[in-house]
Amino acid sequence: AFAASEGDTCGFPTTDQYIRIYERTGGNVSPRLASMRYGNDYYFASVYARRDSGIETLEDMNGKTWIYNETGSTSGYVLPHDVFKANGITVGGIVESGGHTNSMVALIEGQGDFCTGYGSPPLPPAEGFWAGWQWRYGMDPELWIWGKANNALYSDKKDRGMCVDLRRAVRKIYDLETVLTDIGVVMTMGPVPNDCLCFGPDFPTDIADTIVATIQDQFKDEAMKALWNDPNFYEWTAVNEITDSYYDSYRDLLGIEK
Protein backbone atom coordinates (compact mmCIF):
# COMPACT_ATOMS: atom_id res chain seq x y z
CA ALA A 1 0.00 0.00 0.00
CA PHE A 2 2.81 2.43 0.85
CA ALA A 3 4.71 1.68 -2.35
CA ALA A 4 1.62 2.04 -4.52
CA SER A 5 0.07 5.02 -2.74
CA GLU A 6 -0.47 8.36 -4.40
CA GLY A 7 0.72 10.38 -1.43
CA ASP A 8 -2.10 9.81 1.02
CA THR A 9 -0.84 6.85 3.05
CA CYS A 10 0.38 6.70 6.62
CA GLY A 11 0.54 3.85 9.07
CA PHE A 12 2.12 2.09 12.02
CA PRO A 13 4.36 -0.61 10.49
CA THR A 14 6.35 -3.14 12.43
CA THR A 15 10.11 -2.85 12.23
CA ASP A 16 10.50 -5.34 9.40
CA GLN A 17 7.53 -3.89 7.54
CA TYR A 18 9.14 -0.46 7.72
CA ILE A 19 12.40 -1.77 6.25
CA ARG A 20 10.48 -3.34 3.37
CA ILE A 21 8.53 -0.11 2.80
CA TYR A 22 11.83 1.78 2.67
CA GLU A 23 13.18 -0.64 0.08
CA ARG A 24 9.98 -0.68 -2.03
CA THR A 25 9.75 3.12 -2.11
CA GLY A 26 13.45 3.73 -2.68
CA GLY A 27 13.70 5.47 0.66
CA ASN A 28 10.76 7.77 -0.07
CA VAL A 29 9.12 7.21 3.31
CA SER A 30 9.23 9.34 6.44
CA PRO A 31 9.25 7.76 9.92
CA ARG A 32 8.30 10.44 12.44
CA LEU A 33 7.41 8.90 15.79
CA ALA A 34 8.73 5.75 17.46
CA SER A 35 6.83 4.05 20.23
CA MET A 36 8.13 3.87 23.77
CA ARG A 37 6.99 1.07 26.03
CA TYR A 38 7.69 1.43 29.75
CA GLY A 39 10.73 3.61 29.10
CA ASN A 40 12.19 1.45 26.31
CA ASP A 41 12.49 2.32 22.62
CA TYR A 42 13.24 -1.26 21.65
CA TYR A 43 11.95 -4.80 22.05
CA PHE A 44 13.26 -8.19 21.00
CA ALA A 45 12.21 -11.59 19.76
CA SER A 46 11.84 -14.25 22.42
CA VAL A 47 11.64 -18.02 22.24
CA TYR A 48 9.14 -19.43 24.74
CA ALA A 49 8.82 -23.06 25.80
CA ARG A 50 7.46 -25.10 28.67
CA ARG A 51 10.00 -25.15 31.46
CA ASP A 52 9.83 -28.96 31.58
CA SER A 53 10.23 -29.39 27.79
CA GLY A 54 13.99 -29.87 27.83
CA ILE A 55 14.39 -26.98 25.39
CA GLU A 56 17.13 -24.87 26.93
CA THR A 57 19.37 -23.88 24.00
CA LEU A 58 19.09 -22.99 20.33
CA GLU A 59 20.29 -26.47 19.37
CA ASP A 60 17.44 -28.04 21.35
CA MET A 61 14.98 -26.61 18.80
CA ASN A 62 16.23 -28.93 16.06
CA GLY A 63 13.42 -31.24 14.98
CA LYS A 64 10.84 -29.54 17.21
CA THR A 65 7.54 -27.98 16.18
CA TRP A 66 7.76 -24.20 15.88
CA ILE A 67 4.76 -21.96 16.53
CA TYR A 68 4.80 -18.44 15.10
CA ASN A 69 2.15 -15.87 14.25
CA GLU A 70 2.77 -15.02 10.57
CA THR A 71 5.68 -14.62 8.20
CA GLY A 72 5.57 -10.82 8.15
CA SER A 73 6.20 -10.52 11.87
CA THR A 74 9.62 -9.23 12.91
CA SER A 75 9.76 -10.99 16.27
CA GLY A 76 7.49 -13.91 15.46
CA TYR A 77 9.13 -15.04 12.25
CA VAL A 78 11.66 -12.85 10.41
CA LEU A 79 14.35 -12.56 13.08
CA PRO A 80 13.98 -16.13 14.45
CA HIS A 81 14.00 -17.54 10.92
CA ASP A 82 17.26 -15.76 10.14
CA VAL A 83 18.84 -16.93 13.40
CA PHE A 84 17.72 -20.53 12.81
CA LYS A 85 19.05 -20.47 9.25
CA ALA A 86 22.40 -19.00 10.29
CA ASN A 87 22.83 -21.68 12.95
CA GLY A 88 21.65 -24.68 10.93
CA ILE A 89 18.46 -25.25 12.92
CA THR A 90 15.87 -27.34 11.08
CA VAL A 91 12.50 -27.53 12.78
CA GLY A 92 10.35 -30.64 12.58
CA GLY A 93 7.11 -28.82 11.87
CA ILE A 94 5.41 -25.45 11.97
CA VAL A 95 2.15 -24.03 13.29
CA GLU A 96 1.15 -20.62 11.93
CA SER A 97 -1.18 -19.25 14.59
CA GLY A 98 -2.30 -16.00 13.00
CA GLY A 99 -1.47 -13.78 15.97
CA HIS A 100 1.01 -13.28 18.80
CA THR A 101 -1.51 -14.14 21.51
CA ASN A 102 -2.64 -17.17 19.50
CA SER A 103 0.95 -18.43 19.46
CA MET A 104 1.15 -18.42 23.25
CA VAL A 105 -2.26 -20.10 23.49
CA ALA A 106 -1.11 -22.79 21.04
CA LEU A 107 2.02 -23.39 23.11
CA ILE A 108 0.05 -23.68 26.34
CA GLU A 109 -2.39 -26.06 24.67
CA GLY A 110 0.45 -28.29 23.46
CA GLN A 111 0.11 -27.67 19.73
CA GLY A 112 3.86 -27.20 19.35
CA ASP A 113 7.13 -27.39 21.25
CA PHE A 114 8.11 -23.72 21.31
CA CYS A 115 6.82 -20.41 20.05
CA THR A 116 8.43 -17.17 19.02
CA GLY A 117 7.02 -13.69 19.50
CA TYR A 118 7.69 -10.33 21.00
CA GLY A 119 9.70 -10.00 24.16
CA SER A 120 9.69 -6.95 26.41
CA PRO A 121 12.00 -5.88 29.25
CA PRO A 122 10.58 -6.91 32.63
CA LEU A 123 9.65 -4.08 34.99
CA PRO A 124 11.36 -3.94 38.41
CA PRO A 125 9.53 -4.24 41.74
CA ALA A 126 7.82 -1.05 42.87
CA GLU A 127 9.47 -1.26 46.29
CA GLY A 128 12.77 -2.33 47.78
CA PHE A 129 16.32 -2.50 46.45
CA TRP A 130 15.40 -2.91 42.77
CA ALA A 131 12.80 -0.13 42.64
CA GLY A 132 13.61 2.36 39.90
CA TRP A 133 16.09 0.10 38.09
CA GLN A 134 16.02 -0.08 34.30
CA TRP A 135 16.50 -3.41 32.53
CA ARG A 136 19.05 -3.38 29.71
CA TYR A 137 19.27 -5.77 26.77
CA GLY A 138 21.53 -8.70 27.57
CA MET A 139 20.29 -9.02 31.14
CA ASP A 140 18.19 -12.01 32.23
CA PRO A 141 14.82 -11.65 30.41
CA GLU A 142 13.11 -13.06 33.50
CA LEU A 143 14.91 -10.85 36.00
CA TRP A 144 12.64 -10.00 38.94
CA ILE A 145 10.16 -12.64 37.74
CA TRP A 146 11.75 -16.10 37.96
CA GLY A 147 14.32 -17.09 40.56
CA LYS A 148 16.90 -19.34 38.94
CA ALA A 149 18.39 -20.35 42.29
CA ASN A 150 15.23 -22.10 43.46
CA ASN A 151 13.67 -22.55 40.00
CA ALA A 152 10.43 -20.81 40.92
CA LEU A 153 8.59 -17.52 40.78
CA TYR A 154 9.62 -15.07 43.45
CA SER A 155 7.26 -16.01 46.26
CA ASP A 156 7.12 -12.56 47.84
CA LYS A 157 5.22 -10.41 45.37
CA LYS A 158 6.81 -7.29 46.85
CA ASP A 159 10.13 -8.58 45.50
CA ARG A 160 8.68 -9.54 42.14
CA GLY A 161 8.69 -7.34 39.08
CA MET A 162 6.08 -7.23 36.35
CA CYS A 163 6.07 -9.41 33.26
CA VAL A 164 5.03 -7.46 30.15
CA ASP A 165 6.12 -9.94 27.48
CA LEU A 166 3.97 -12.25 25.36
CA ARG A 167 2.98 -14.40 28.33
CA ARG A 168 1.08 -11.46 29.81
CA ALA A 169 -1.07 -11.28 26.67
CA VAL A 170 -2.98 -14.41 27.72
CA ARG A 171 -3.73 -13.25 31.27
CA LYS A 172 -7.47 -12.95 30.53
CA ILE A 173 -7.55 -16.51 29.21
CA TYR A 174 -5.32 -18.31 31.73
CA ASP A 175 -4.10 -17.66 35.25
CA LEU A 176 -0.93 -15.60 34.78
CA GLU A 177 0.80 -17.15 37.80
CA THR A 178 0.36 -20.58 36.24
CA VAL A 179 1.54 -19.37 32.83
CA LEU A 180 4.70 -17.82 34.30
CA THR A 181 5.33 -20.99 36.29
CA ASP A 182 4.90 -23.27 33.28
CA ILE A 183 6.31 -21.19 30.40
CA GLY A 184 9.83 -19.76 30.36
CA VAL A 185 12.00 -17.67 28.05
CA VAL A 186 14.62 -19.86 26.37
CA MET A 187 16.50 -17.08 24.59
CA THR A 188 16.13 -13.64 23.06
CA MET A 189 17.15 -12.14 19.71
CA GLY A 190 17.71 -8.44 19.21
CA PRO A 191 17.41 -5.73 20.30
CA VAL A 192 14.96 -4.42 17.71
CA PRO A 193 13.86 -0.78 17.33
CA ASN A 194 10.18 -0.30 18.12
CA ASP A 195 7.37 0.20 15.64
CA CYS A 196 6.67 3.69 14.35
CA LEU A 197 4.30 6.14 12.74
CA CYS A 198 5.46 6.83 9.21
CA PHE A 199 4.21 8.58 6.11
CA GLY A 200 4.28 7.37 2.54
CA PRO A 201 5.71 9.00 -0.59
CA ASP A 202 4.75 12.66 -0.99
CA PHE A 203 2.36 12.68 1.97
CA PRO A 204 1.51 16.39 2.55
CA THR A 205 4.03 17.69 5.10
CA ASP A 206 1.59 20.07 6.78
CA ILE A 207 -0.92 17.30 7.41
CA ALA A 208 1.82 14.94 8.63
CA ASP A 209 3.04 17.63 11.04
CA THR A 210 -0.49 18.07 12.38
CA ILE A 211 -0.92 14.33 12.93
CA VAL A 212 2.43 14.09 14.72
CA ALA A 213 1.67 17.09 16.94
CA THR A 214 -1.79 15.72 17.76
CA ILE A 215 -0.41 12.36 18.87
CA GLN A 216 2.27 14.08 20.95
CA ASP A 217 -0.43 16.19 22.62
CA GLN A 218 -2.51 13.08 23.32
CA PHE A 219 0.32 11.72 25.47
CA LYS A 220 -0.03 14.81 27.66
CA ASP A 221 -3.67 13.91 28.37
CA GLU A 222 -4.10 11.12 30.91
CA ALA A 223 -7.24 9.65 29.32
CA MET A 224 -5.73 9.54 25.84
CA LYS A 225 -2.42 8.25 27.18
CA ALA A 226 -4.31 5.42 28.91
CA LEU A 227 -5.89 4.52 25.56
CA TRP A 228 -2.53 4.38 23.80
CA ASN A 229 -1.15 2.36 26.73
CA ASP A 230 -3.94 -0.24 26.55
CA PRO A 231 -2.39 -3.69 25.83
CA ASN A 232 -5.37 -4.36 23.54
CA PHE A 233 -4.45 -1.25 21.51
CA TYR A 234 -0.81 -0.27 20.83
CA GLU A 235 0.54 -0.33 24.41
CA TRP A 236 2.56 2.82 23.75
CA THR A 237 3.51 4.64 26.95
CA ALA A 238 5.29 7.53 25.19
CA VAL A 239 6.63 8.56 21.77
CA ASN A 240 9.97 9.81 20.45
CA GLU A 241 10.63 11.79 17.30
CA ILE A 242 12.83 9.80 14.89
CA THR A 243 14.35 9.72 11.43
CA ASP A 244 15.23 6.73 9.25
CA SER A 245 18.58 6.31 11.04
CA TYR A 246 16.63 4.95 14.01
CA TYR A 247 16.39 1.66 12.09
CA ASP A 248 20.07 1.36 11.18
CA SER A 249 20.70 -0.95 14.14
CA TYR A 250 18.12 -3.39 12.77
CA ARG A 251 19.73 -3.25 9.34
CA ASP A 252 23.06 -4.04 10.98
CA LEU A 253 21.48 -6.92 12.91
CA LEU A 254 20.26 -8.59 9.71
CA GLY A 255 23.12 -7.49 7.47
CA ILE A 256 20.89 -5.31 5.31
CA GLU A 257 22.55 -2.54 3.32
CA LYS A 258 20.76 0.79 3.12
Question: How would you describe each model-predicted region?
Answer:
Residues L33-T57, L197-F199:
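Hydrophobic/proline-rich hinge and linker segments of small-molecule sensing/allosteric domains
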Residues S53, K64-P204:
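Pocket-lining segment of extracytoplasmic ligand-binding domains
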Residues D16-R20, E56, D60, L79-V83, ...:
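Extracytoplasmic/secreted proteins, especially bacterial periplasmic and envelope-associated proteins
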Residues N28-N40, G184-T188:
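A structural signal for short loop-to-beta-strand junctions that line the ligand-binding cleft
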Residues A1-N28, N102, P122-E127:
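Pocket-flanking alpha-helical
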Residues F2-S5, M61, A106-I108:
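Hydrophobic residues within well-ordered alpha-helices
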Residues W133-L153, K157-C163, C198-K258:
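An extracytoplasmic/periplasmic, membrane-proximal ligand-sensing/linker region
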